[in-house]
Amino acid sequence: MLYTEKQREPIELINEKRNGLKSYNDMSSNTKTAIRKTLLREQGHLCAYCMQRIDLQNMTIEHYIPQNQSDREADDMLSIDYNNMLAVCSGNIDGANRKSDLTCDKHRGNIPLTVDPRDEYSIEKICYKDDGTMYSLDPNINRDLDETLNLNCTTTLFKQNRKSVLDVVKQGILKRSAENRIAKRQLENMLAKLQTKNDEKYVPFCGIAIWYLRKKLSRY
């Protein structure tokens, strides 16, 4: 999971609100498409939760504070608040035979979360194991990752994909430090590359590599 700095809402949403838009269900398809495009650019075309690649065809708009109309806490104004919106994947719905196969918002439902992609402090509490497992020493965030969002789901390739990204970074470090201890500047360059979008896109599952490089840099 990566920190997402929310940007200005798309002009299409601003105009609809000016024209009296009161709830997400009344929003036009054109405005929803504009929101999807803006969210994708904002998040580097990665799911806000699992960090797999998403695009216009396989993403959905997630309300961080759930806005299901059956929920007594639903708030029409929050349903059209751009700051409450995230782009997420399909939640493994095509490969699911039971609920335990679902991930991200499809597994979450309307359960409140502690971890928040919009809050850098909470994202910094996420850790990873060498096998790609996501966890946190904060019990509430750990529950979000492992249970509510099911981000270590064994019927997906999430853990394997994270491990693959981490292995590439480790191999790069080994190659650069074959003769000497890798320079801090080299680690900073590797980190900067992962944190920079290429053609509006981040590397899928890059969170584990960013976490690893930051940990290495903290020792200098």
Where on the chain are the PLM-derived regions?
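Long, low-complexity, intrinsically disordered segments enriched in glycines and aromatic residues
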Residues: 97-158
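C-terminal, charged low-complexity interaction regions
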Residues: 140-220
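Short Fe-S-cluster ligation motifs
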Residues: 10-14, 74-91, 119-135
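Histidine-centered active-site/metal-ligand motif
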Residues: 63, 104, 162
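Short cysteine-rich loop/turn motifs with clustered Cys
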Residues: 34-59, 91
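Short, charged surface segments at domain edges that flank catalytic/cofactor-binding sites
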Residues: 2-46, 70-72, 76-80
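Histidine-centered nuclease catalytic patch
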Residues: 52-87, 91-100
